[in-house]
């Protein structure tokens, strides 16, 4: 696999970019997660960043990538509506793993947003998408720009939802390379990694949560529900960061 030219790939239409990366992705599918991270660091341009929502299984990708590339900037987009358990989990993992945490927030505070727009998450898909644009997408775009990111690692997995089922290891999103080292891991592999390295699930895992985001758009899992139905009232799975 040869080095890739980000500028040249960004000039291509989306379909052509996918085709241009197809051969590389076929080879990356053969590597394990650590091998994918190592390949990306050797062959893709820096600066490098890792995003995390500090969700249920977040410790895996945080530990895996940080072990190979210590001090990598870890981007968190904080909406101001995370669970108290999430904020404590962020503190715990940041200390335990010595993370280089970079927190980005909307330019409008949560209270100001509610005063201006009402509770956007109660206004259907359109309201949720506006909420996500303000609190997730714009802060992430700002983070990528301010950190001069050219390669972005994330912990998405195909097993998590239908919208992620066909994602490749390597893609281009928001003008940068995006690498998903654990994309093909199943829940058993996640568990084994956590056990091997003395890591924990998010505290709300024990309370029946399979996925954790904001307090007002996250539900406990109930029998018969798909994991993606526990977020955004089942109206959508993605918060916007991993779309586009």
Curated annotation (Swiss-Prot):
<dbReference type="InterPro" id="IPR011800">
    <property type="entry name" value="PAPS_reductase_CysH"/>
</dbReference>
<comment type="pathway">
    <text>Sulfur metabolism; hydrogen sulfide biosynthesis; sulfite from sulfate: step 3/3.</text>
</comment>
<dbReference type="InterPro" id="IPR004511">
    <property type="entry name" value="PAPS/APS_Rdtase"/>
</dbReference>
<feature type="active site" description="Nucleophile; cysteine thiosulfonate intermediate">
    <location>
        <position position="239"/>
    </location>
</feature>
<dbReference type="InterPro" id="IPR014729">
    <property type="entry name" value="Rossmann-like_a/b/a_fold"/>
</dbReference>
<keyword id="KW-0963">Cytoplasm</keyword>
<dbReference type="GO" id="GO:0004604">
    <property type="term" value="F:phosphoadenylyl-sulfate reductase (thioredoxin) activity"/>
</dbReference>
<keyword id="KW-0560">Oxidoreductase</keyword>
<comment type="function">
    <text>Catalyzes the formation of sulfite from phosphoadenosine 5'-phosphosulfate (PAPS) using thioredoxin as an electron donor.</text>
</comment>
<dbReference type="InterPro" id="IPR002500">
    <property type="entry name" value="PAPS_reduct_dom"/>
</dbReference>
<dbReference type="GO" id="GO:0070814">
    <property type="term" value="P:hydrogen sulfide biosynthetic process"/>
</dbReference>
<protein>
    <recommendedName>
        <fullName>Phosphoadenosine 5'-phosphosulfate reductase</fullName>
        <ecNumber>1.8.4.8</ecNumber>
    </recommendedName>
</protein>
<dbReference type="GO" id="GO:0005737">
    <property type="term" value="C:cytoplasm"/>
</dbReference>
<comment type="similarity">
    <text>Belongs to the PAPS reductase family. CysH subfamily.</text>
</comment>
<dbReference type="Pfam" id="PF01507">
    <property type="entry name" value="PAPS_reduct"/>
</dbReference>
<dbReference type="GO" id="GO:0019379">
    <property type="term" value="P:sulfate assimilation, phosphoadenylyl sulfate reduction by phosphoadenylyl-sulfate reductase (thioredoxin)"/>
</dbReference>
């Amino acid at each position: 696999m040869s080095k890739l030219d980000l500028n040249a790939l960004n000039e291509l239409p989306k379909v052509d970019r996918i085709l241009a990366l197809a051969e590389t992705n076929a080879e990356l599918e053969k590597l394990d997660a650590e091998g994918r991270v190592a390949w990306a660091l050797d062959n893709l341009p820096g600066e490098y960043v890792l995003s995390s929502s500090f969700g249920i299984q977040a410790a895996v990708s945080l530990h895996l990538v940080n072990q190979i590339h210590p001090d990598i900037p870890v981007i968190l987009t904080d909406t101001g509506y995370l669970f108290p358990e999430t904020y404590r989990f962020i503190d715990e993992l940041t200390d335990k793993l010595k993370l280089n945490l970079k927190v980005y927030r909307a330019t409008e505070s949560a209270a100001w947003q509610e005063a201006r727009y009402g509770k956007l998450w109660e206004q259907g898909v359109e309201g949720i998408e506006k909420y996500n644009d303000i609190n997730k997408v714009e802060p992430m775009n700002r983070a990528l720009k301010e950190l001069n990111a050219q390669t972005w690692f994330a912990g998405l997995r195909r097993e998590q939802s239908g919208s992620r089922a066909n994602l490749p290891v390597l893609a281009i999103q928001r003008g940068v390379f995006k690498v998903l080292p654990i994309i093909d891991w199943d829940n058993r592999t996640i568990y084994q990694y956590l056990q091997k390295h003395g890591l924990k699930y998010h505290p709300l895992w024990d309370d029946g949560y399979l996925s954790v985001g904001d307090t007002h758009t996250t539900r406990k899992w109930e029998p018969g529900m798909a994991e993606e139905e526990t977020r955004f009232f089942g109206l959508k799975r993605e918060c916007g960061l991993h779309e586009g």
